[in-house]
Amino acid sequence: MSASKILVGCWLGLAVLSVSTVLLGNAGATLALAAGVLLAAFGKAWLITDGFMELRHAPPAWRLLLLGWPLLMAIGVLLTLL
């Protein structure tokens, strides 16, 4: 698959996740909806890291650092909501 097709796919994925984040955020204030918003945000972080930054071919330590941080932040936010 060419790089431009990958980037277009990433852009479409980011657009879908952004719209879903807005829809979930406006749907109410439950723990499940908050978890859905955070899951969409983590999906966006993954798309940016692997797609736009092209770290899918990088050493695992770099990917762990760049995907571990948003995961830790999402877990922290969920823990504060409990």
From Swiss-Prot:
It is a multi-pass membrane protein. It holds the Pfam family COX4_pro. It is found in: Cell membrane. InterPro entries: Cyt_c_oxidase_su4_prok. Its main location: membrane. The chain crosses the membrane at residues 1-21, 22-42, 62-82. Keywords: Cell membrane, Membrane, Transmembrane, Transmembrane helix. GO terms for cellular component: plasma membrane. This is Uncharacterized 8.5 kDa protein in nirQ 3'region. It comes from Stutzerimonas stutzeri. The lineage of its organism: Bacteria, Pseudomonadati, Pseudomonadota, Gammaproteobacteria, Pseudomonadales.
